[in-house]
């Protein structure tokens, strides 16, 4: 069996609403180009926690915790065309969304 060409698009963001909007715009662009698509598949959210002292001098027991959540989505595009790649490169995504494209 011959392996088909596919492009894997991974999206990262701290804001899940912006991430879903970006994934939806990519899906619409791929469907407009009549290519097959798998996704968006939600990947596990990475949570990074930071613990800091509330006071700079005393009260070691008084601490505060902060967390950063990194949400991820995965989109597979099967058998992409050059026209599809051009439309994906011209696609305007909101600030705060990181896009990683691999073949």
From Swiss-Prot:
Family membership: Belongs to the universal ribosomal protein uS10 family.
Subunit structure: Part of the 30S ribosomal subunit.
Keyword Ribonucleoprotein: yes
Gene3D superfamilies in alphabetical order: Ribosomal protein S10 domain
Known role: Involved in the binding of tRNA to the ribosomes.
Upper lineage: Bacteria, Pseudomonadati, Spirochaetota, Spirochaetia, Spirochaetales
GO molecular function: structural constituent of ribosome; tRNA binding
Entry annotated with the keyword Secreted: no
GO cellular component terms given for this protein: ribonucleoprotein complex; ribosome
Protein name, UniProt field: Small ribosomal subunit protein uS10
Organism: Borreliella burgdorferi (strain ATCC 35210 / DSM 4680 / CIP 102532 / B31) (Borrelia burgdorferi)
Name of the gene encoding the protein in the UniProt record: rpsJ
A biological process from GO: translation
Record's keyword terms, sorted: Ribonucleoprotein, Ribosomal protein
Lineage: superkingdom: Bacteria
């Amino acid at each position: 069996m011959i392996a088909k060409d596919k492009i894997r698009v991974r999206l990262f963001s701290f804001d899940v609403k912006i991430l879903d909007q970006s994934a939806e715009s990519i899906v619409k662009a791929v469907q407009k180009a009549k290519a097959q698509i798998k996704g968006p598949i939600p990947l596990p959210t990475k949570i990074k926690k930071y613990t800091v002292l509330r006071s700079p001098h005393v009260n070691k027991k008084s601490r505060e915790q902060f967390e950063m959540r990194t949400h991820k989505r995965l989109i597979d595009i099967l058998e992409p065309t050059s026209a599809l790649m051009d439309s994906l490169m011209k696609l305007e995504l909101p600030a705060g969304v990181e896009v990683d494209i691999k073949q």
